[in-house]
Amino acid sequence: MRLKVLTLTLAVTVSACSEDPVQPTGVPSPTASAAAQSAGANRSIVEFNGQLRKDFRSQVAALGGRVDFVAEGVGFAGVSGLSATAVATLRRSPGIAAVYDDITVQVDAVRRGSAVAADVSAMSPANPAAALLFPSLQWNMVAVNAPAAWAAGNLGSPNVTAAILDSGIDYDNFDMNGLVDLARSTSFVPSDDAILAALFPTRNPIDDLGGHGTLVATQASSNALVFAGVSSRTRLMGIKVLGFTGSGSLGGILAGLVWAADHGADVANMSLGVTGGVDKAHEGLFVGIVNRVFNYAQSKGMVVVVAAGNDAIDMDGDGRNFSAFCEAPHVICVSATGPTSGMPFQGPWGNVDAPADYSDIGRQNITVAAPGGSNFGFVSALCARHFIQVVNNAPTFPCISGTFILGGAGTSASAPHVTGLVAQLIAKYGKGRPSQIKHLLINGVDDLGAPGKDPFYGYGRINVLKALSQ
């Protein structure tokens, strides 16, 4: 997702928003950590035959590696630091079914923009339509008929949890404060953990250094002080699987999905994809483990919403690659719509339901469409305060004051609109019924494009009020 940062002058303050970064000696720099994170050949996924051996961690340590995570419910682990010889030794060990190199997942980088001014002191999450910048910037919420749903009392429930698998969440900014369940949140990105411990040692490991996750989370659920989300009461679980550079490992992402299912998430949002796809002929192991993990999530009663991808690929004609996560079982795969005219942060926006030119499509895989934005109209949120930009090999923090907003376009932004609606459907119709919730979602869309299911919109563009009025 392409993002732009804008200055936002706020008339009220938030605790902990003015923490200044420090760079102690003897700790990894952001650039060094990013290089380590991108070294995909040094990360491996280990599949077990049956249950995890009790001595697995010590065995990996003896071989010179480290266990980064274990997903016992599905029978795999992620390790790093093993040499080729050590990997070969581990493959021959009792109880090990397979060991193979992990692969990298990537989202688009961020870009900077210009300034606006605002006052959030009179806003309230009880009325999302009164959010400070809803009238002037959030064409996306209007496009999915969210204001009418809010007016009818559909605000979501704190008893429903949406897991955001992403770069983290700025968990105590205006729009997130109190919504994020830190006790059930976690990080699968050791490189980011090291940066946070060095620069912002009092922050939770899910603090967002990349900006992407906070924008995504806001579309699903928000306090609606500055920007409204589809829901204003849904709880959020932050699961960091992407570092500040926007990259992470497939193994870490799958482990994050297992974590979400094991810790009571009702719906999970995955606004990310495998760089270049996965070649089915040569990477069949990955397809197998992806299927196992998504089947596990379904068995735990969790709905999984995934972004279609931003490569303008027709997935119907690309039978060689496992595209993003849209081919995984049980998922809701979301394409993007966006305006065809207007100024990105000013409007007026024309034809907001047009298929976005970057969105991956495919009659077989696309379930529904939702606003993702375009060069003419962005999807926006508060910028994560500890968002890192590296300038001349040194970290800078353009959003540190808490007075910035972020705008972007991509299927990363469209997916969380659906996640917020799914959370509301679960609040209304009950938990643990992912197939029923998917049916209700599909039954409540506006059928755009060719009648029935088509490659661009799937079954149609979501309509929040219509889906919640069944």
Region annotations inferred by a language model:
Residues R2-L8:
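Sec-dependent signal peptide recognition
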Residues V14-A16:
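C-terminal motif of bacterial Sec signal peptides marking the signal peptidase cleavage site
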Residues P21, A151, G156-P158, N223, ...:
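Substrate-binding/access-modulating region of protease and related hydrolase catalytic domains
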Residues P21-S114, A151, P158:
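Inhibitory N-terminal propeptides of secreted protease zymogens
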Residues Q23-T25, P94-T161, F174-N177, D192, ...:
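Protease zymogen maturation seam
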Residues A122-L133, V189-D207, G277-G284, D316-R320, ...:
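Surface-exposed intrinsically disordered loops and tails
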Residues L137, A148-T186, P190-G251, H263-V267, ...:
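Subtilisin-like serine protease catalytic core
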Residues D166, S323-A427, K431, L465-S469:
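Extracellular S/T/G-rich loop segment that most often corresponds to the catalytic His/Ser-adjacent loop
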